[in-house]
Amino acid sequence: MISSAEDLWHQILERLQLLLSRPTFETWIKTATVQSFDGQTLTICTPNPFARNWLQKYYLKTIADVAREIVGKPVEIELAIAQGAEHDTSIRPTSRGEVEATPPAARHRGSELNPKYVFSRYVVGPNNRMAHAACLAVAESPGREFNPLFLCGGVGLGKTHLMQAIGHYRLEIDPNAKIFYVSTEQFTNDLIAAIRKDSMQSFREHYRAVDVMLVDDIQFIEGKEYTQEEFFHTFNTLHEAGKQVVLASDRPPSQIPRLQERLCSRFSMGLIADIQPPDLETRMAILQKKAEYENIRLPREVIEYIAASYTSNIRELEGALIRAVAYISISGLPMTVENIAPVLSPTVRKIETSPEIILKVVSEALNVPISDLKGNSRRREISMARQVGMYLMRQYTGLSLPKIGEEFGGKDHTTVMYSCDKVAELQRTDPEMGSLLRQLSDRINLASRSTEP
């Protein structure tokens, strides 16, 4: 029995706290209050238009579903802005099925920030520690220490996450802050549209009346002379006004072809923070945190397997986790390495490597000289290391069995086949062997990447 609007909202909050991650709940749900409930419509007040728009876009259906479960019938949700917010003098409900026009103060694309891209969900490791610290410093004191801040790194390494985390952090401190997140492609498209409509003045006011400007994929500005010209003046206007500029690219400014020298100079005059691919421990931590936020229980060996299989970027890593979880959910099988391996194997991209790298990795990791790997010693530790090396060489090279035998001192191809089958069987039945192979695979991947031109 629902005694009041406050009682219903309290029950909804209790359930949402279990359904959503803690940062999401505390940032977007806990700050809202209830205004009324007439038996059919529940009106919820948010502290500002930004929060209202966010709930409307991402959590309205979840709230409605929870309310329906509690009340026992469909409940319509209306979102309103609390009295006094954004200098308003009244509560203004947002009509169902219609998103209210964004107020001028919120028209900057801060409202397009991904709610998951916050600092609390970013896993810090040796590969990104400097970039994370720089972004946090910028978020706390924009326009001071590192301006501009230039983030560079490969695809899927977390540049966009860090950029948008800066925006979220500033909006938590000051909901009225004008945060502008935009891709270089969007900047170019807006510029072209402004030229066609003869509205350059409006374009410039739009892009220059911001507190923090976050520009993604700035490398795509290369060769676009007029875009570079306009961006140069936009950058200067913001920088001279003490406004923070954060740029992200897949390469440092000096390596962006056909970039004007003056832009290259300005992009480089702040801090350039490089983000590298995460190491094995960081990848495992990323998977663990992702699983915790999604309320997924993962055995450690599964985390190790996925982390060792996907080494290039975080996007692929999380995609593999999603595929594994989806398969287990649909099939009803237990979450084990054996069950998820067939689902992930077709898309696991092993790096083609050389026999020399594999011999070196196995020798160093197992403390067995390469001469012994190629020799005929039957000592248990040497024989096992040799078999592991043969297995890995079959996995990571295109060599035939006879060719692999030649790499190990002229062994017969039947010996290679026996060794590969034995190690494969041990991988399925012996957790220690599985862990060893994942560690060696990770080392091979890293060693192979370091030798790429």
Curated annotation (Swiss-Prot):
The keyword Cytoplasm applies. Residues 73-111 are annotated as: Domain II. GO terms for cellular component: cytoplasm; plasma membrane. GO terms for biological process: DNA replication initiation; regulation of DNA replication. Residues 112-328 are annotated as: Domain III, AAA+ region. Coiled coil: none annotated. Belongs to the DnaA family. HAMAP family: DnaA_bact. This is Chromosomal replication initiator protein DnaA.
